[in-house]
């Protein structure tokens, strides 16, 4: 009888082509997502060596990082560098026979949102993309992670990837989530607990009552930020919630093929007694709404908390780092989080740009008005999310409250397009990174859930969504 295996072990074993004596492995890749930023050199490498894309049907390309989200984007991209990257992806996709969603295709959107929407992402698969937040797709019980540009070329040419196996970590989140606490708060709490290096060398499996209770959108939020916890990937075993989400998606199996697939997908779970190299446990019932205060995703506190004092940190290097973060953020120790005013609010990104996120934000802002001191924007994660939101009238709620309603794209998650912070501006953001300059030169980012961001837009400062009226 074989030894008990984790979910990660099972997917790894199913895709192992070859293993060298030193542990270097060759993995087969089932799905390859491509965007305009990390692919130009890879396609050029194929061109120079006279190679073709080995499996175009397992490859999907979309523009997301550089595209404007303004209503007039159909008139063209003004920034020359961005325009060239977008045009080059269109050219490369056509030349190498790869399916491509342009900025004018309603299926276009952030790469990690369109994959699941199309049924391109399925349980048990190996999925890669030249983007660190590829871990998002692990919510389906797939092994998904980012790769570098040279690896993008390797996968395009061979449909394989050279890897060494990571260790197994289990993050068990038991208990029921209190009202006002979301998947975003869970993952920020996890990163606050283990630190941004806590997952280094690991693949994380998320489990427990609180995780099982989440929708697919919530699970994608959790897995999305695995990389912020230092992990190679994050995954959640598929279940009936997963299967229901997949049914009817354009590229998903149908009929008897779907039944056969589900029978296999039901085996994708860690065996009883499987070995994990590290186990972390959290009680969801004790989690508050969370806000980041510094320039690292591990810099988090309860919304009812205060900005911490770095002098209480014993490690000299870490203490200096946290003082630098406070200086950059323009904050002082002891400041109440609810006393921090915001200039901008961004609701969107591959972390929180799905229909469930927009519905939650709309409930908070309906009948209210954005504070006069705040500029707030809603950026749907894809054209299909935007279409669904408009069918439900969410756009009207946001516009009536004073939010900008934008076209889909990565937008203000990163300063690679027209949506960015000005120096010194403070933003409540539903994205995944609060690094220095991430949203714009000298911009200050606070990571929060969609409901917390929406409430901050109305109040003009952070508020406890549990007490929001």
Curated annotation (Swiss-Prot):
SUPFAM superfamilies xref list: Aconitase iron-sulfur domain
Biological process annotations from GO: L-leucine biosynthetic process
Gene3D superfamilies cross-referenced by the UniProt entry: Aconitase, domain 3
InterPro entries (alphabetical): 3-IsopropMal_deHydase_lsu, Acnase/IPM_dHydase_lsu_aba_1/3, Acoase/IPM_deHydtase_lsu_aba, Aconitase_4Fe-4S_BS, Aconitase_4Fe-4S_dom, IPM_dehydratase_rel_enz, IPMI_cat
Catalytic activity, reaction form: (2R,3S)-3-isopropylmalate = (2S)-2-isopropylmalate
PROSITE patterns reported in the protein's UniProt record: ACONITASE_1, ACONITASE_2
Keywords: 4Fe-4S, Amino-acid biosynthesis, Branched-chain amino acid biosynthesis, Iron, Iron-sulfur, Leucine biosynthesis, Lyase, Metal-binding
Pfam families found in the cross-reference section: Aconitase
Cofactor(s) the protein requires to work: [4Fe-4S] cluster
Cofactor note: Binds 1 [4Fe-4S] cluster per subunit.
Stored CDD domains: IPMI (cd01583)
Residue numbers binding [4Fe-4S] cluster: 350, 410, 413
Presence of the UniProt keyword 4Fe-4S in the record: yes
Catalytic class of the enzyme: lyase
Pathway(s) served: Amino-acid biosynthesis; L-leucine biosynthesis; L-leucine from 3-methyl-2-oxobutanoate: step 2/4
GO molecular function, one term: metal ion binding
Its EC number(s): 4.2.1.33
Protein purpose: Catalyzes the isomerization between 2-isopropylmalate and 3-isopropylmalate, via the formation of 2-isopropylmaleate.
Subunit structure: Heterodimer of LeuC and LeuD.
Entry-linked HAMAP family: LeuC_type1 (MF_01026)
Record protein name field: 3-isopropylmalate dehydratase large subunit
Gene: leuC
């Amino acid at each position: 009888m074989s030894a008990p295996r984790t979910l990660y072990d099972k997917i790894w074993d199913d895709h192992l082509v070859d293993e060298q004596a030193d542990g270097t492995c060759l993995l087969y890749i089932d799905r390859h997502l491509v965007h305009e930023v990390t692919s130009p050199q890879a396609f050029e490498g194929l061109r120079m060596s006279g190679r073709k894309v080995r499996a175009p049907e397992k490859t999907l390309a979309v523009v997301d990082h550089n595209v404007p989200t303004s209503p007039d984007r159909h008139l063209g991209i003004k920034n020359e560098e961005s325009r060239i990257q977008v045009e080059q992806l269109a050219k490369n996709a056509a030349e190498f026979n790869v399916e491509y969603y342009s900025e004018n295709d309603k299926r276009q959107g952030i790469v990690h949102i369109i994959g699941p929407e199309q049924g391109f992402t399925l349980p048990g698969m190996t999925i890669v993309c030249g983007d660190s937040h590829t871990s998002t797709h692990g919510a389906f019980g797939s092994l998904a992670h980012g790769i570098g540009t040279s690896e993008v070329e390797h996968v395009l040419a061979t449909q394989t990837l050279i890897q060494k196996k990571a260790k197994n970590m289990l993050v068990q989140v038991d208990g029921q989530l209190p009202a006002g606490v979301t998947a975003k708060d869970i993952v920020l709490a996890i990163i606050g607990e283990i630190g941004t290096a806590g997952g280094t060398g690991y693949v994380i499996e998320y489990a427990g009552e609180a995780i099982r209770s989440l929708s697919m959108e919530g699970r994608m939020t959790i897995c999305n930020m695995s990389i912020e916890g230092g992990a190679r990937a994050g995954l959640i075993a598929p279940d009936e919630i997963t299967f229901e989400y997949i049914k009817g998606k354009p590229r998903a199996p149908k009929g008897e093929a779907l039944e056969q697939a589900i029978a296999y997908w039901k085996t994708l779970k860690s065996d009883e007694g499987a070995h994990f190299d590290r186990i972390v446990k959290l009680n969801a019932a004790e989690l508050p709404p969370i806000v980041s205060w510094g320039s690292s995703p591990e810099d988090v506190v309860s919304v009812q908390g205060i900005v911490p004092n770095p002098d209480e940190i014993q490690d000299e290097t870490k203490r200096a780092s946290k003082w630098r973060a406070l200086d950059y953020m323009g904050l002082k120790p002891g400041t109440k989080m609810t006393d921090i005013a915001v200039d901008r609010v961004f609701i969107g990104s591959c972390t929180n740009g799905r229909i469930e996120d927009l519905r939650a934000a709309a409930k908070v802002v309906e009948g209210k008005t954005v504070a006069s001191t705040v500029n707030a924007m809603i950026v749907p994660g894809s054209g299909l999310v935007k279409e669904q939101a408009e069918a439900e009238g969410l756009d009207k709620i946001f516009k009536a409250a004073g939010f900008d309603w934008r076209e889909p794209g990565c937008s203000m998650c990163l300063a690679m397009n027209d949506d960015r912070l000005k120096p010194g501006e403070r933003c409540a953001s539903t994205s995944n990174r609060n690094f220095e300059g991430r949203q714009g030169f000298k911009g200050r980012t606070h990571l929060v859930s969609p409901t917390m961001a929406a409430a901050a837009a109305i109040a003009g400062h952070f508020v406890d969504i549990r007490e929001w009226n």
